[in-house]
Structures are given as structure tokens and as C-alpha cells.
């Protein structure tokens, strides 16, 4: 779970018997501490590892990447999804969503909506990933990398 925030998706996945282990990656130490506290309260702390960066996980390939409500906050979201592609194998799935919009009255001031950045993101997405059906979360899109 990249940019996992308060841990909603990481904890839900950790509670699933179908999930072996979850890596919660967030640059914010307060978030990591809070989710670790929640994991202990829920009894799933052994199924989670808390990291500041993807590199800190020391995992070369992931089965699933969850990145929700994060890409629109990055200066170069295209580079990030290229990085994700590099840590996926041919059967991996990435769950993404985004909202590249600052709002009509700057309601979302921390969102990226520069047209060149957004266009580069979509070009990168479409040339590196294939959208696939998934029953996991209807507000996201699931992608596998193009071989």
C-alpha cells in the first residue's frame, strides 16, 4: 500500500485470509505509527511491515500494488507508475486511482493538474499498462503491465 495514509486499505487487506503480507509505505512517520497502533489493536501486526520508501521493503517484485489518492499529489506521477511497473512481474496487479484536479476554486490545492504532467501520466499509463477487470474496489482501476 503505497502512500497508505491512515491505513484503511492496508488493514483491510491484512485481515483477509487471502493476503499473506502487506507492506505499508508512507513517508509520514505519524501515519506509520498510527497504522501500526491500529494493526496491533486489530491483531494483524504480524501481517504488516511499515516502511518509509518502497526500497525500504527490500522486495524486488510485488504481487499487488495499491496506490489510492496519491498520484495526484506527486510532482511526476508518470515516473512513479514506471517505478511500479519495475517492481511488478507479469501476473502482478496494480490498483490505482487519481484526481488530477485542483477544483474550480482551488478546493484541492495539493493536487497536480498541470496539463503537460497529466498528459505525460496518461501516455505512460497507456503505453505500459493494460486495464483489467477486478472485483476488488469499484472506485479504482486495476492494471497489469504490458509484456
Each language-model region and where it sits:
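Conserved SAM-binding loop of SAM-dependent methyltransferases across substrates and taxa
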Residues: 6-18
